[in-house]
Structures are given as structure tokens and as C-alpha cells.
């Protein structure tokens, strides 16, 4: 028996969000963080280092590309495609484009495609019969296409509003590639009921891409879940049986091919580690998925009568499966934040289906909390920036000097102009939201998304020099280079993948692993690995010159040694 839908939506509540405004808003969120910054520690710099290594190994054939290594060390994430894309982008980019920016271009595209695929996935889910609002006795209910478009707009705004999306979606790491291909699979399964070719191509791209980006097990689970959903739906849908069979066979074949690809390339790895710190994991869930998690819970509550018949309500079944898989992965794997990133499209989808059932008081609570939180964050960013430029107020300026010793602030007219424009746009948006306008179900997500975009833009403009100084390895490498000169040959011991990549990129150093032979005039050692140095090198050949500290990190020291024997070559 079909349960009555809790969505009661009139046609006037699904008015169109202007396309130009939506596109410009998405660009304002996507571009800051990709333009004008240094590669950051650790994952961002590490991934870029593997891309540089692949670019330098073009002459060694394709076999080197199947097992990327950085000075003989394999990547922590068994991914291939993200490193390939970055290396290809640097290879094809003209010489006047900086290598690190060229490597980011495919990731700009992947973040864009993530937003697009999520929008279309929700659009198709919202057109399914079980998602439709209550039909009014005398007409006037929302038309299916307009209703679906309004919910898709709401889901896109909800996804951008997620606090956990901002940083990880602007790094050149396998995590963003996994997010992109997850959204491809999501759209592919969601759209198969209405179309065949494009969703199947999207699902194929997503399954193969996720497998090659370090997530073959997740891809397999997504494929199995989509297949089960299609099989259950076939029992209730009699129209176009041949189309449904082709859809099921196609998805089954694609899932099997993705699993076979992972086996052929030896990408299957099991890193299941039960969580040791449940409170920390709980805090991660609370802030990382804000503000979609309370709305997702509201959806489950308001649609609770439909949860027992999920096969007839694909708009609930599909995001619930994707969210369950990714949240389970978050709990059972060490990279919890990067695993939880993959849950955001599904949680944003569930949040979107809360919008037609949201009470006026709850919508007002969301607006007021968002207004206060993001306005306070923006005000803090401006105050600290003013303190960096003028020394007033004194306390924020003193805090910056203490946390980032040696940082010299600079003024950029372009950055200031962008930040000022974003702040004025936020003020206008708040004024518009407080005004009397026709109701639209996506309006409750405007301030959360706008506030998240505002603060991210301010951080990536006003605070970018400070963040580059604090999160880049460049100051550390420059300190070492001032003592060794450049270019120089360095032997290394105990350095992390990110540190190795940074010394190669920022310092143009030739790096060699430390051994009993003094092959270079200089040796650098991570302070945490100093206790094992005697097992690797003959310290009689070296004289300690200095301890170099990364300015913004008291726990990251590099020991610099100089060769004293004349036996090296």
C-alpha cells in the first residue's frame, strides 16, 4: 500500500532560481582555493609530488605509470587516475602556466562535474512517482519538472553549504576524484529510469574512475546497491520491460568490469581499522556534514512511513544506500574525513527532500543561526586581516605574530576587491532573504550556501598569504636552501612524502636516499627519525650544521648535516 507523501507544495513554491545567478555563485565557490596558492601540506603536496614524478618518468614507459612512486615510496592511497590527470595536465600546459596550477585544472573540472552530477541526480530522483507532492483537489500543486528543478537547486545549495566540502574539494588529491566519480555513479543510477544512454555512460565513468582513484570496494558496493534498487523497481514497473532489462544488464556488466579492472591492476586493498576515538569521530560528523545532517534526519522523520517500502521510493533508497556505504567506510578506515567527503552528495540529497516539509519556524531557525554564524566568521576574518595590515587591533596582530613567526603581510588590490565584493554580496543576500518575496522551497538553503561561499572566499583572498606561509613547505625549503645553495644534491632520511615532494618542487634539489656512502655534500633528516640515523649513515662523515624549523609548526624540524669527508663524489 502506497503511503501518502508528506510533501505539500504549490506551484508558486517551485519558482525558478535564476540560472545565471546559480552559475556565478558556483564559480565563486569553485575558483577561490585553486588560484594563486602554493601546494599545501600534507596530502595536497604529496599528491602533487607523485604527479611530478610521473611527468619525469615519461621515458620509462607505461609500466611506471601503473605503480607511481616518490623516491621508491608508493602512495598511501592506491590511486592511479588522479596522478595521471595531474601529470597529463602539466604535460599539455604551455610553459607560462605554473606546474602546480596546471595540475589543479583537472580538479577544477572534477569539482564542477561533482556539482553538476549531484544536481541532475536529485532532479531525476525528484521526478520519480514516490517523490511527488500531494495532488490538490482543485489543482495548483507543483508540476513534476518544476518541483524536481527546485529540489535539485536546493540540493546543490545544500552541498555547497557543507563545511567539510570547502578544503578537501580544493585540494589536488584522490579524495576529490573519488567524490567526483561517486556523484557520477549517483547520477547514473538515479537517471536510468528516465533515460538510458547518458546515465549508463555516467555510471560506467563513475565505476571505472572510482576504481582507479583508490575506491574499488566502494565502487563495487555502489554498483551492487544500484543493481538491487533496479531489480526491486522492476517488480513494480510494467512499462518498457526491455528498457529495464537493458538497464539492469548494463549496470551488472559495468560493476563486474570495474571489479575486474581493480583485480587486473592489483588495486584491492583492505585497510579496516576499528575507530579508537569515538568522541573525535562524533565531532567530525557534527561539523563536517553541517548543515545537511539535521535536515537529513528531518527527511527520515517526515518520510518515515515510506521507509518500510523503499523500493517504491527511490529518492530515499538511493541516497540512504550511498550515505550508509560512505559513513561505514568513515568509521572503519583511517582517513575518516576523506571518506566522509563521499557522503556529502547523498546527505545533501536527503536534505533537499526535507525542504518541502520544512516548517516555517525551523526554516527561520536555520536562517538565524546561519546569519549569526557566518557573519561572525566573516567579521573575524576581516578584523584579523586589518590587524595584519595595520597592527590594530593589537591582540589579533600579536596572535598572528606568535603563531606564524617571520610572516610578512602583503596587500593585494585584486584580493581586497574580490573580498569586498563577496562581503557586499552577502549583505545584499541577507537583505533579500529578509524581504517579502514569494516562497520558494530552495530559499532556506540560500543563506547557508552563501555564508559558506563567503567565508571560503574571504579565507582564499584576505588570508591566503598567511595560509600559504602556515600551510606550505616553501618557508622550510627556502630556509634550507639559504644554507646549502641551489641547486644542490641532498641525501635524505626519514622525510615524509610531502617533505620529499616539497624539496624537489620548491628547492629544485636532487634528492638521494641516505646510505653508508656520502653521495651528496648535504644530508637532511627529519628530527623524528634522528634515532634511526645511525643505522643508515656513517655519522663520522657528517657534521651537524643546523636545526631548521618550519615557522608555523613547532613539531616539524629538519636536521641539516654537511659532509666533512672527501670520499664522496
Model-derived regions: residue spans:
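Transmembrane and membrane-interface helices of multi-pass
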Residues: 148, 156-161
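Extracytosolic helix-loop segments that constitute the early lumenal/periplasmic catalytic or substrate-binding loops
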Residues: 47-77, 81-84, 88
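Membrane-embedded architecture of ER/inner-membrane glycosylation machinery
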Residues: 2-19, 23, 172, 191-569
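Specific aromatic-rich, kink-prone transmembrane helix
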Residues: 164, 177-194, 347-350
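Loop-to-helix entry region of an early transmembrane alpha helix in multi-pass inner-membrane enzymes
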Residues: 80, 84, 93-116, 120-121, ...
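Transmembrane-helix motifs of polytopic, lipid-linked glycan transferases
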Residues: 105-143, 160-161, 184
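Short acidic/glycine- and proline-prone juxtamembrane loop motifs at membrane-interface regions
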Residues: 164-177, 216-218
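Hydrophobic/aromatic residues in alpha-helical transmembrane segments
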Residues: 118-121, 165, 185, 296, ...
